[in-house]
A protein has these predicted regions:
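Charged, low-complexity intrinsically disordered regulatory segments in eukaryotic signaling
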Residues: 2-15
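Core RNA-modification/binding signature centered on pseudouridine synthases
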Residues: 15, 150-229
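Extended, well-folded interaction surfaces typified by the phenylalanyl-tRNA synthetase beta subunit core
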Residues: 19, 24-26, 30, 34, ...
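Short, charge-patterned binding micro-sites
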Residues: 55-87, 117
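Ordered, amphipathic secondary-structure segments that act as subunit-interaction surfaces
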Residues: 79-132
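Helix N-cap motif at beta-to-alpha junctions
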Residues: 88-93, 137-140, 193
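Short amphipathic alpha-helices in soluble, non-transmembrane regions
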Residues: 95-104, 142-152, 202-204
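Short, low-order "capping/linker" segments at domain edges
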Residues: 120-139, 172-174, 227-229
Length: 229
C-alpha cells in the first residue's frame, strides 16, 4: 500500500518539541578583547563539543536556532551578555550552566540559565544601557562626567572616508561619580538604537579623545545592564 505523500511546507505531526532557553553570561579580563563574531563562533563550537541536543534551521545552510544580544564593543567588559537557544528537550539549568562554564574560555562565565524563555516583542525605541566607567583620577572622572552630561558635547566619526558629526543630545541620561577605594567610578546610563543618537561605543571613543593626555586615567569600561525600551 503506497505511503501518503507529505505536502510541501506542512509540519510533521511528530515534529520534536522545542524549548527556548536564555543563557546569561559575562565577558571580562582578556575575553573582552574577543570580537563579537569570534564570540559567536566560540559559543557555537562549545555547544557542539557538549553534544547538546538543539534545534536547527531549515534550508541549505543548516545552523543552530540561536540568537545573540547586541554586540559588545571590543575592549568593553560586560556582565549582561546573553544568547537564546532552542533546545530539543527541557534543560537541567544547573547542569547546563556548569557544563558551559567547564567548556568556555577564561573570562567568559555563564551567570544564569533561564528556562522556559519567551521572547519579548521587540519595539523600535532602542535600548537602555548601563555602564561603570573606571578612573584612577578624580579630576579626570569629573572632566568625563561634565562632558557626558552636556547635551551639546560634539564629536566627529570618520568611517570609510566619510565624516559624520554627532552631539551627545539625549544619549546620556545620567552620570554619577562615586569613590571606589583609590579609584573613581562613573555610573552612566545611556540610550542607543534611536535615530540620530550615537551609540555607546562612539561616545566612549570620543570621550577618550576628549580626555587627551589624561586618557590613561580612564582604564576600564563595564556594561552592567541592558534592556529594550
Amino acid at each position: 500500500m503506497p505511503m501518503p505523500r507529505r505536502l510541501p511546507g506542512r509540519k510533521s505531526m511528530n515534529q520534536p518539541a522545542e524549548y527556548k532557553t536564555r543563557i546569561n553570561y559575562s565577558k571580562t579580563r582578556q575575553a573582552r578583547y574577543i570580537a563579537h563574531l569570534d564570540t559567536i563562533d566560540i559559543i557555537c563550537k562549545t555547544l557542539r563539543r557538549m553534544q547538546l541536543s538543539y534545534a536547527v534551521t531549515q534550508g541549505c545552510h543548516v545552523r543552530p536556532k540561536i540568537s545573540f544580544g547586541p554586540p559588545l564593543p571590543l575592549g568593553h567588559a560586560s556582565f549582561c551578555e546573553y544568547f537564546v537557544i532552542t533546545l530539543c528537550q527541557p534543560p537541567d539549568v544547573e547542569k547546563l550552566k556548569s557544563a558551559l562554564n567547564h567548556e568556555l574560555p577564561q573570562g567568559m562565565e555563564v551567570l544564569s540559565v533561564e528556562f522556559p524563555w519567551a521572547d519579548k516583542k521587540s519595539g523600535s525605541a532602542g535600548e537602555q544601557v548601563d555602564y561603570r566607567l573606571h578612573f584612577s583620577s578624580r579630576q579626570t572622572a569629573e572632566q568625563a562626567r561634565i562632558w557626558l552630561l552636556n547635551p551639546e558635547s560634539a564629536f566627529q566619526v570618520i568611517r570609510k572616508g566619510t565624516t559624520r558629526n554627532y552631539t551627545i543630545g539625549k544619549a546620556v541620561q545620567k552620570a554619577e561619580l562615586t569613590e571606589a577605594g583609590n579609584n573613581w567610578l562613573l555610573q552612566a546610563e545611556f540610550i542607543q538604537g534611536q535615530a540620530d543618537v550615537p551609540s555607546v561605543s562612539k561616545i566612549v571613543t570620543a570621550l577618550a579623545a576628549h580626555l587627551d593626555t589624561s586618557r590613561d586615567d580612564f582604564y576600564l569600561m563595564e556594561r552592567i545592564a541592558l534592556k529594550e525600551l
